[in-house]
């Protein structure tokens, strides 16, 4: 749980996402309210529920990125799902309860990784002992062990092939699990038999370098209490979990359509108790969804937010509209953000010892072409920049190993040379860009 103020949260989001001030403020307040709730006394804390958010805006404007960055800031369990993947209970497909089960699975992995860090020093020592034992034998003298330990730390043994016993992670009984049943608190035959045959090990040959992470994770897991990991992960999900439901507009039954799609409306009805607050059975234990923050998003090109079930609209009280991105926004995305594509391509080409310099005119030309193709073909927002950049660098990326030591300046002329003809031809850009 982070104690950042709303202003600090927005400032952090500004490093990666251009514009969309309203959406940033809404999620910043929602996250800060989590911290405020923690400060309350027990009698009122359970009465304070998160205000779920509905983001409305075209594709590629930052809806998903805002939620993903928010979860990283909060160090909270996060899951992104598409509403279109789910079907009403009773139909073939996934039911919405699997959202919470997937969120718990993600939280278990995150919690275990974080707890491994706490015991890392002891785990590294134990992993080193196993490597030394595999090289020098169990009966080696202490002096010999210390000699090998020194070589190991200096990396002199990294290429040495050793044979070690590691846990056998394959589960031959997995086929006994009906799809999803093991997740539902029902009898999980695969897990029962897996435990019966559990503790199995297998001997594997690998280099010392390859064995490091495998053995360290095994030794760390021996030092962790599985029940503590589960309890911590479940608490994190219930108190801090964030679920991002994309494409919510695709499960709207439009008011102007005759005979509404039963399954679409059914998905909305199944989402109601989940967002309102219910208890979902998972293989790690029951999870209450009352205090999980749900952020739904959709483009709403055809359907309208009012086409959602009235009950679902009421459970998404905060609405923010994200505007379409302009050419000026694209210039800022390419030059100001911490994860700008220009920086990424510079770093990629640097591995081939090719220097890249972007001029201001070059960045403006890239932004101009992306905006023009969005206008003339289909507006996919900032994602268009990926296509444009890949096209501009296609030739250089292919020949980079042969151009080691060169310096390349990406200016307006360079962009025109690599992309101009494609951008001008509407027919070509429709298929290529």
From Swiss-Prot:
- What superkingdom heads the lineage? Bacteria
Query: For ATP, which residues are the binding ones?
Result: 18, 60-65, 246, 311, 383
What does the UniProt keyword field contain? Answer: ATP-binding, Chaperone, Cytoplasm, Nucleotide-binding, Stress response
- Any one GO molecular function term: ATP hydrolysis activity
Q: Where in the cell is it found?
A: Cytoplasm
The keyword RNA-binding appears for this protein: no
Q: Which GO terms describe its cellular component?
A: HslUV protease complex
Q: Cite a single GO BP annotation.
A: proteolysis involved in protein catabolic process
Coiled-coil intervals in this record?
none
Show the disulfide pairing. Answer: none
The reply to whether ATP-binding figures as a keyword in the UniProt entry is yes
Complexes and interactors:
A double ring-shaped homohexamer of HslV is capped on each side by a ring-shaped HslU homohexamer. The assembly of the HslU/HslV complex is dependent on binding of ATP.
Family, according to the entry, reads as follows: Belongs to the ClpX chaperone family. HslU subfamily.
Q: What does this protein do?
A: ATPase subunit of a proteasome-like degradation complex; this subunit has chaperone activity. The binding of ATP and its subsequent hydrolysis by HslU are essential for unfolding of protein substrates subsequently hydrolyzed by HslV. HslU recognizes the N-terminal part of its protein substrates and unfolds these before they are guided to HslV for hydrolysis.
Q: Which HAMAP family match?
A: HslU
Q: Which NCBIfam families match?
A: hslU, PRK05201.1
What this protein is called in its record is ATP-dependent protease ATPase subunit HslU
Q: Which organism is it from?
A: Cereibacter sphaeroides (strain ATCC 17025 / ATH 2.4.3)
The organism's lineage is:
Bacteria, Pseudomonadati, Pseudomonadota, Alphaproteobacteria, Rhodobacterales
Gene that this sequence comes from: hslU
